[in-house]
Amino acid sequence: MLSRRIIPCLDVNAGRVVKGVRFQQLRDAGDPVACARAYDAQGADELIFLDITASSDERKIMHDVVAATAEQCFMPLTVGGGLRTVADIETMLKAGADKVSLNTAAIKNPQLIADAAERFGVQCIVVAIDAKREPDGQSWRVYTHGGRNPTELDAIAWARRAVELGAGEILLTSMDRDGTGDGYDLELTRGVSDAVSVPVIASGGAGTLQHLADVLDQGHASAVLAASIFHFGTYTIAQAKAFLGQRGVPVRS
């Protein structure tokens, strides 16, 4: 069985790492370069850097901050937020990113996924999906622009389509659970994981180490993303790996 990855996420707003609850009430969590250095030292498997207001502000991602973060980061780095063209993606890869995360732009122009995958390889292309449970409780709607704008897309159907177009990985965030510490949306994660043939990174809701184990087991996720529990010192990466390892989850040492 492939090792399960533990991935801290840097949500960056105006050059600072922030963390909110359900995409609101942002708290400052530090300098992105310092955070990247710390997570590298702690042994994180990968790092995700998301410029969370680049799409809603209709501006480019902060190249200099990404480049400085990549310099301190010797694990795989995924960068997302405000990437709209193949040229934007190339700029980020040249700045030091190993993978790029596409969200709003991929929904506006799904061909971008195919074009980027053809140019850089599917292993480079992560499609991020921000999903909120519908009132019927049985489905999840996709949102864009940092969770601000609802679409007509169903999360599971969109994940399937994104993979058909060339996504090599899905970054799946439950907007209902984001920052709550109440645990991941296991139903949503399992629904998407079982629908696609590529790895799914579960995001939104980690509050305890048991939550990580639950979404890997019951949610069928390939990797877990967490922010609050690592940024604010509740747990370390090493503690997370030890906890999972003791429960028979294969993790990288």
From Swiss-Prot:
<keyword id="KW-0028">Amino-acid biosynthesis</keyword>
<comment type="pathway">
    <text>Amino-acid biosynthesis; L-histidine biosynthesis; L-histidine from 5-phospho-alpha-D-ribose 1-diphosphate: step 5/9.</text>
</comment>
<dbReference type="InterPro" id="IPR011060">
    <property type="entry name" value="RibuloseP-bd_barrel"/>
</dbReference>
<feature type="active site">
    <location>
        <position position="11"/>
    </location>
</feature>
<comment type="similarity">
    <text>Belongs to the HisA/HisF family.</text>
</comment>
<dbReference type="Pfam" id="PF00977">
    <property type="entry name" value="His_biosynth"/>
</dbReference>
<dbReference type="GO" id="GO:0016833">
    <property type="term" value="F:oxo-acid-lyase activity"/>
</dbReference>
<keyword id="KW-0368">Histidine biosynthesis</keyword>
<keyword id="KW-0963">Cytoplasm</keyword>
<dbReference type="InterPro" id="IPR004651">
    <property type="entry name" value="HisF"/>
</dbReference>
<keyword id="KW-0456">Lyase</keyword>
<dbReference type="GO" id="GO:0005737">
    <property type="term" value="C:cytoplasm"/>
</dbReference>
<comment type="subunit">
    <text>Heterodimer of HisH and HisF.</text>
</comment>
<dbReference type="InterPro" id="IPR050064">
    <property type="entry name" value="IGPS_HisA/HisF"/>
</dbReference>
<dbReference type="InterPro" id="IPR020021">
    <property type="entry name" value="Glycosyl_amidation-assoc_WbuZ"/>
</dbReference>
<protein>
    <recommendedName>
        <fullName>Imidazole glycerol phosphate synthase subunit HisF</fullName>
        <ecNumber>4.3.2.10</ecNumber>
    </recommendedName>
</protein>
<dbReference type="GO" id="GO:0000105">
    <property type="term" value="P:L-histidine biosynthetic process"/>
</dbReference>
<comment type="function">
    <text>IGPS catalyzes the conversion of PRFAR and glutamine to IGP, AICAR and glutamate. The HisF subunit catalyzes the cyclization activity that produces IGP and AICAR from PRFAR using the ammonia provided by the HisH subunit.</text>
</comment>
<dbReference type="GO" id="GO:0000107">
    <property type="term" value="F:imidazoleglycerol-phosphate synthase activity"/>
</dbReference>
<feature type="active site">
    <location>
        <position position="130"/>
    </location>
</feature>
<dbReference type="InterPro" id="IPR006062">
    <property type="entry name" value="His_biosynth"/>
</dbReference>
<dbReference type="InterPro" id="IPR013785">
    <property type="entry name" value="Aldolase_TIM"/>
</dbReference>
